[in-house]
């Protein structure tokens, strides 16, 4: 496998897994309260990574504060927001807002570095988010609450901070040791409310399997792959895995839930994939003179390229 192919796999596979996560969360909510879903997926994720010997590789003592931050900002806090949010907003809007994840990651990276991303990357982010919006339009309704939207936005801001923290930690220690410890921190933080909810849940086979898949896949494997991608190619490029989430959710909605898909949704899915390709390879747009655009932004905002 070439380096470029491996990098694409690091982006596509988490998107495929997370695209199915909303189905697993919805199934889990049939058996347990939202805080129980959060604790269950995090605890299963921690146990999954415990099976890997590399998880126990020592990490620098100075990095423990950052790892704890990842446990809070990447895991405990945002994963607590989504189950509550899904009770107040439509799946279409949830998918659209998740498509904005790379924008939040890029914004946080720009604030930390005092530097805007390259023009081609900015264009790709805009295209990808535009695709997510187009996909969601047919499913938007007036039933979405401001409270649910705020929960999702807070989760995305948290992701934006966490991915930028995780990159240097992964480069120094490796993704599995960092995420295993971060999941341990998140398990401890979510246990006081989550464990009683799990113990008092009305479990049947379907939600139990859903939580196992959500924890092992979406909370362990996908997070490790994304942390690896952040270390290899930067937080902003790693975050474009989010552009695949609404595409996968659309496909699963048709196959599993037999939902009707509009032409507009299919167009949006194609736009999402184009945006991901542009961010991964900004040279696709070299003929559009993004450097000149960057110079204008530099003069007007005080950032540098």
Regions found by a protein language model. Give the residues of each.
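C-terminal-most transmembrane helix of multi-pass membrane proteins
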Residues: 1, 41-42, 137-138, 207, ...
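Juxtamembrane helix-entry segments on the extracytoplasmic side of multipass membrane proteins
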Residues: 3-8, 30-39, 59-65, 137-158, ...
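Specific transmembrane alpha-helical segments of multi-pass solute transporters/efflux pumps
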Residues: 17-25, 50-98, 134, 215-233
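Hydrophobic/aromatic residues within transmembrane alpha-helices
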Residues: 28, 37, 41, 85, ...
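Transmembrane alpha-helices of multi-pass small-molecule transport proteins
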Residues: 30-77, 102-109, 157-165, 179-198, ...
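Helix-helix packing/entry segments at the starts of transmembrane helices
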Residues: 39-40, 75, 94-100, 163-187, ...
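Hydrophobic transmembrane alpha-helices of multi-pass small-molecule transport proteins
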Residues: 43, 49, 68, 108, ...
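Transmembrane alpha-helical segments that form core, pore/gating elements
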Residues: 46-49, 105-107, 111, 125, ...
